[in-house]
Amino acid sequence: MNFYSLLPSRHDVSADNITEKFCQFCLCCNPWYAGADTRQLANAFNMIPKSEGQKFEIWVLFLLVRQYHQKIINSWSKLVGFLGVERKDEQSTQKIQQYVVRLKRWMSQTHVDAFFDYLLNKPNPYYLEIPETQPQVRCNVNVTDDLVIKSLRAGLMSHPDVNSSSISTMRTSTSPSNWIHSASASLDDNTHNLGSFVTNPHADSQECPTPQSLLMRASHHMSERGSQQAHQTTPQNHSLPHPPNMFEPPDEDHQLPSAANNSHNHDHAFQTAEAVGVADSIDPDWHQWPDDLRDVSSPKESDGLNDSWSRQTNQVETENVENEAGVPRKRGRPPGARNKIKRLRSEPSVSLTLSISWYERFEKLMHAQNTMLRSAFSHVARLPMETVSQLLSHYTETISQYLPPSETSPIPKTPNFKFISSTLLALVSSHSEILEASTDRLIWTVHQGPLTATICHAFNLEKAPSMHSLAEAQMIPDVPISHSNSMEPLDTVSSLKLEIAKLNAALKEKNLELENLKRKIMNAVFD
């Protein structure tokens, strides 16, 4: 089962279900908080920063952001103006810009910007690169400032009982594929629970929205196991599938890893999720949370509870570290040493990500993806591999002949040729389909993980042959396309477009001669 199928659908977004989809999106991107109550998360999502006490709707903000990405609105100042933020004559001229800064900070802390990118089919590392463990900083947002994490932690602490039959089903799962499959089996039965809490967050109900509709329901099991084992002595690691890259060869079956290779990682993931339920859900900055997120009657009561739990937790944590290290407890140990041990114990393990330059990756995958490109052509067009190889070889050679020389590079044609070649190679890094192939244009649709793109190669009929025989690839969101799996017209594309370009060049020369002749006649008449 594909991991991206657990993300909410972006095609039926409306004002009634956008909050529900946001909660589902956050739970899917933060699987460590499986079983959390999403009522406070829904409240945080709908709490757009106010301006002079004026409240704004999240659906209106989404529509304006979509128009901003579509270049209908060309600045954030105009966007907040359409949202309803106004500056009076006696107010500062920086009021609009100050609210823009507040709005962007709130969107970053709640990851609403990543959610909007997902709905608008734009890549974002928040949902494309889910880390193995919860990092201290994610998408430039510290965990102490992350409103999504705070809401989910508070939801874990106030979660009611969960059905025991679902827990037994989850514990018997031995592989990530079974883990997600068991969760998706109850997707239809539990989706209405999430929607009911979003639409009516104050309703008295025994059921609450849980990520069993996304991943699994395990809050009750976390609380039971967390009270017995507040901290594990050995840090556990768990793995989640990483999304495919546009320039990396994809898996042939586009499936999650096999159970034999990942059953041990799944056990670690389940144990780590259990430990998050109690001890790790206690935040030292609990008293700094907003009142609507803490949901407590008195700040003093919250502070006292937090202090007592923090002292207990820190004492147990320090003793466990000392016992593991075999260090005898000495009187008069400096407080700095204890703080250092606790700091090292609490620091999360961040996996190293090696960044490879684009050109190095291009050179390494050139041969492999060329083979994949020919295979994709052969499969879609139902042509033999020999015919496809000859066709593409002639096609790319014709392109390289008519590319303009590069002024910055000492080797002409090479950067431009790599640019167009990489565009062609990226088309087969995942499922691709030929939508239209004619003498005018070649249109593809590419499905890359949760993203979908339509790419059009239009043959340029206006410029001379010495400039471009093929225009650059254009991303087209919505175009009327006639579906066709036939590639027979491509056999004559190179010759036809060259003849048409020559005719256009000759026509331009005739028009230029005609204009010069008219100019001479007019000069002779007036002289």
From Swiss-Prot:
<feature type="modified residue" description="Phosphoserine">
    <location>
        <position position="298"/>
    </location>
</feature>
<dbReference type="GO" id="GO:0005634">
    <property type="term" value="C:nucleus"/>
</dbReference>
<feature type="modified residue" description="Phosphoserine">
    <location>
        <position position="302"/>
    </location>
</feature>
<keyword id="KW-0539">Nucleus</keyword>
<feature type="compositionally biased region" description="Polar residues">
    <location>
        <begin position="225"/>
        <end position="239"/>
    </location>
</feature>
<feature type="region of interest" description="Disordered">
    <location>
        <begin position="282"/>
        <end position="344"/>
    </location>
</feature>
<feature type="modified residue" description="Phosphoserine">
    <location>
        <position position="297"/>
    </location>
</feature>
<feature type="compositionally biased region" description="Low complexity">
    <location>
        <begin position="164"/>
        <end position="177"/>
    </location>
</feature>
<protein>
    <recommendedName>
        <fullName>ARS-binding protein 2</fullName>
    </recommendedName>
</protein>
<keyword id="KW-0238">DNA-binding</keyword>
<feature type="region of interest" description="Disordered">
    <location>
        <begin position="160"/>
        <end position="184"/>
    </location>
</feature>
<dbReference type="GO" id="GO:0044732">
    <property type="term" value="C:mitotic spindle pole body"/>
</dbReference>
<dbReference type="InterPro" id="IPR018562">
    <property type="entry name" value="ARS-binding_2"/>
</dbReference>
<dbReference type="GO" id="GO:0003688">
    <property type="term" value="F:DNA replication origin binding"/>
</dbReference>
<keyword id="KW-0597">Phosphoprotein</keyword>
<feature type="compositionally biased region" description="Basic and acidic residues">
    <location>
        <begin position="284"/>
        <end position="303"/>
    </location>
</feature>
<feature type="compositionally biased region" description="Basic residues">
    <location>
        <begin position="328"/>
        <end position="343"/>
    </location>
</feature>
<dbReference type="Pfam" id="PF09441">
    <property type="entry name" value="Abp2"/>
</dbReference>
<comment type="function">
    <text>Binds, preferentially, to the Maundrell ARS consensus sequence within ARS3002.</text>
</comment>
<feature type="region of interest" description="Disordered">
    <location>
        <begin position="219"/>
        <end position="265"/>
    </location>
</feature>
